[in-house]
Amino acid sequence: IYTYKCNDNNYTSIEIVDSKTNIEIDKEKNEIKFIINNKANINELNCDINIQKAKELIKLENNIKKDMKKSIYTTIDKLISEYNADICGFKELIYKTYPNYYKELEKKYGAEILKNLNYKIDINLKLVAKGNILKEITNE
């Protein structure tokens, strides 16, 4: 369940029903890229949005993706900067995929590998179930 705050007093909650993550490593940029593909159902909609209109549904998807991305970046940044915690398994991923590259990073940065890695997150979200709707979604 993910809750999105659409304004000061209203929220929308979605249930992620399918999620797949692809991970790419770019050694030249010291970058790990996460591509997260989610399918979700709308559980609750308390925002002033007419999801019967395709444009508004797409706008809602984009706003939720942006909010999710911000939350993930904030969490990872805090865990790395304050606790040097590797909850995503960045180091293990690099070690398993490119062991020699990992050794280079370890030699260069020691325990500070995480603080010297870049990461990028791309999120795709498709709202697949919208609950009980009395009218058909239009392409307006």
Label every PLM stretch briefly:
Residues 1-140:
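Active-site environment of non-heme Fe oxygenases that use a 2-His-1-carboxylate facial triad
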